[in-house]
Curated annotation (Swiss-Prot):
Known function: Specifically methylates the N4 position of cytidine in position 1402 (C1402) of 16S rRNA.
MF terms (GO), sorted A to Z: rRNA (cytosine-N4-)-methyltransferase activity
Positions of S-adenosyl-L-methionine binding: 34-36, 59, 86, 112, 119
Catalytic activity: cytidine(1402) in 16S rRNA + S-adenosyl-L-methionine = N(4)-methylcytidine(1402) in 16S rRNA + S-adenosyl-L-homocysteine + H(+)
GO cellular component term, pick one: cytoplasm
Protein name, per record: Ribosomal RNA small subunit methyltransferase H
Any one biological process term the GO annotation gives: rRNA base methylation
Keyword Transferase: yes
Recorded family membership: Belongs to the methyltransferase superfamily. RsmH family.
Length: 322
């Protein structure tokens, strides 16, 4: 299997500035090739925090775990690399904390959502409409259902709902009809290029083809990996793990993710003033968190020129109050 390379971590300087502010336990819930984790460890070392700090890296991709282990080998005494989904972040932190005999509250958590360049650039993973490969899209290769399973078993109505809900694709009905027609005439759709061709034939405007392909492939990937369901859980569990002044940093890449992150951060940073019209002088419950980034942080021109895939990245940060 050809393995893609891991790009430079997105918004690395901004992550370090906003996340690494004190010694303690840090969690990289989306370890990938280890780029962000290495930067965090080096920043902890530069600030003199490393001796009193520890980093837990989580990923469900064996290739990512191998790459990260090699990249972080110089900090092996200060890291634990765990195979798993970040939906289990609370259990993983508790387990490592018990084994290492340190507190299970954390100073910082980073979640870099979406697909890594290595996954996109590896044809056998089936994430990209630009590469010929099996229609897979599983971030955990051992997971049961692939994108091909969805494309070949869902009804037309279910496909329409999927593409509209998770891809926000306006031509969902036409594309779903195209898939059903193909299945009836040719059988199963098993390759990325087969699905891409069906989509191209259903998009009348050439200038919209790339966006349509992106939306449909995104919708399938989100469903295969239960991305929004998992994100909802990890946001809640991650926030609950933070120590006083600890921070949760999330990098999102599409509007569905960003809206969910923004909504969660807003809810967590809002005090409870009870029903309208009660006229309380103090809230029933004060907010336990504060939003650090009133507007999401985006990549600058220099980063965009070096890594065009960072163009849609948005960084939001939440802090646990004392």
């Amino acid at each position: 299997m050809g393995i893609g390379s891991y790009h430079e971590p997105v918004l690395a300087a901004e992550v370090l500035q906003l996340l690494v502010r004190m010694p303690g336990v840090y969690v990289d819930g989306t370890l990938g090739g280890g780029g962000h984790s290495l930067a965090i460890l080096e920043e902890l070392e530069r600030k003199g925090f490393l001796a009193d700090s520890f980093l837990i890296g989580i990923d469900q991709d064996d290739h990512a775990l191998k790459a990260a282990s090699e990249k972080l080998s110089g900090f092996s005494g200060s890291t634990a690399i765990i195979k798993g989904n970040f939906s289990a972040i609370a259990a993983i932190v508790r387990k490592i904390s018990a084994e290492r005999h340190f507190t299970d509250s954390v100073a910082g958590i980073l979640l870099d959502l979406g697909v890594s360049s290595a996954q996109i650039d590896t044809p056998e993973r089936g994430f990209s409409y630009m590469r010929s490969g099996p229609l897979d899209m599983r971030m955990d290769p051992e997971a049961e259902s692939s994108a091909a399973d969805l494309v070949n078993t869902l009804s037309e109505r279910e496909l329409v709902t999927l593409f509209f809900r998770y891809g926000e694709e306006p031509r969902s009905r036409s594309i779903a009809r195209g898939i059903i027609d193909y299945r009836e005439k040719h059988g199963s759709i098993l390759r990325t290029e087969e699905l891409a061709e069906i989509i191209r034939l259903r998009e009348a405007r050439p200038d919209r083809v790339i966006k349509t392909l992106s939306r449909v492939f995104q919708a399938l990937r989100v469903e295969v990996n239960r991305e929004l369901e998992v994100l909802e859980q990890v946001l809640a569990d991650g926030a609950s793990l933070l120590s006083a002044q600890g921070r949760l940093a999330v990098i999102s890449y599409h509007s569905l993710e960003d809206r969910m992150v923004k909504s969660f951060f807003t809810a967590q940073s809002s005090s409870d003033w009870g029903p309208r019209g009660v006229g309380l002088t103090e809230p029933l419950k004060k907010a336990e968190f504060a939003v650090v980034t009133r507007k999401p942080v985006a990549s600058g021109q220099q980063e965009l020129s070096l890594n065009p895939r960072s163009r849609s990245a948005k960084l939001r940060v939440l802090e646990k109050l004392a």
